[in-house]
């Protein structure tokens, strides 16, 4: 429903806001701006492995916040 979609969007936004600056910048550049890992590494002036790690950690943190809303448990994907 529209209400559920809004609730998910609000939860995702709150989860992104709660991330550390490095994690937030990496996930926004990837998922919102659509940059490649290589482009993000250039923008953030760090190795590509660091970018991959930051994006992974950001996605995990967001997933943890979404679990109660989506009715999933740890280890499950939606």
Language-model-detected regions and their locations in the chain:
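Acidic, proline/glycine-rich intrinsically disordered inter-domain spacer in sigma factors
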Residues: 1-14
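Residues within the DNA-recognition helix of helix-turn-helix
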Residues: 11, 54-57, 61
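Glycine-rich ATP/GTP-binding catalytic cores of kinases/NTPases
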Residues: 2, 36, 72
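Helix-turn-helix DNA-binding module
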Residues: 13-25, 29-50, 64
């Amino acid at each position: 429903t529209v209400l559920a979609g809004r609730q998910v969007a609000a939860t995702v936004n709150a989860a992104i806001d709660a991330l550390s600056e490095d994690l937030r910048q990496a996930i926004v550049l990837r998922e919102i701006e659509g940059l490649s890992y290589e482009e993000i590494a250039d923008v953030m002036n760090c190795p590509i492995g660091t970018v991959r790690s930051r994006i992974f950690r950001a996605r995990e943190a967001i997933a943890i916040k979404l679990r109660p809303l989506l009715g999933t448990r740890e280890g499950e994907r939606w």
